[in-house]
Amino acid sequence: MKVIASTLRKGNVVEKDGKLYVILFAENIHPGKGTPVTQLDMRRITDGVKVSERYRTTEQVERAFVEDREHTFLYSDGEGFHFMNPENYEQIAVPEDVVGDAAPYLQEGMAVMLSVHNGVPLTIELPQRVTLEVAETEPVLKGQTASSSYKPATLSNGVRTTVPPHIAAGTRVVVMTADGSYVERAKD
């Protein structure tokens, strides 16, 4: 289906020269002089090569039909990351390069959105927030309640982030999956 280039967003899949590309970054640029353009950073699905393209904002681009389905993460092994469709219990193995930066945040039983084109997994979308345990951080210092400074911490999945001074090792915290930033102390 043809769409105007300016409507493309991160995660969309486009077809160019018979090959499929997933959009990693999309930006509409409106210079003071000249025609507006849409800058797309894409990854070719077949071999993972990154490509950068510029289109006029009114230019038509072929968008591939992609099915977004909810899947449950089961486990990972040498073949990749294994997910199950909760509707028909069908399992699918997703290669490591498709999962990418999402790998540390995957937890057994987690529901994720998987984009599939002709049975081939293209992209994975995590929930916005996940709850993880702080594995290691500096000790809590008394009297540091007034400052808004944060201290470095390592989470149970190996991701490094910054947390408020009152958070100690072993505390469960909620973090954003997009950038690993601290949101709040877990309520459970």
Swiss-Prot record:
Give the principal location in a single coarse category: cytoplasm
* Metabolic or biological pathway: Protein biosynthesis; polypeptide chain elongation
The reply on keyword Nuclease is no
Q: Which PANTHER family match?
A: ELONGATION FACTOR P, TRANSLATION ELONGATION FACTOR KOW-LIKE DOMAIN-CONTAINING PROTEIN
What the protein does comes down to:
Involved in peptide bond synthesis. Stimulates efficient translation and peptide-bond synthesis on native or reconstituted 70S ribosomes in vitro. Probably functions indirectly by altering the affinity of the ribosome for aminoacyl-tRNA, thus increasing their reactivity as acceptors for peptidyl transferase.
List the NCBIfam families. efp (TIGR00038), PRK00529.1 (NF001810)
Similarity section: Belongs to the elongation factor P family.
Q: What is this protein called?
A: Elongation factor P
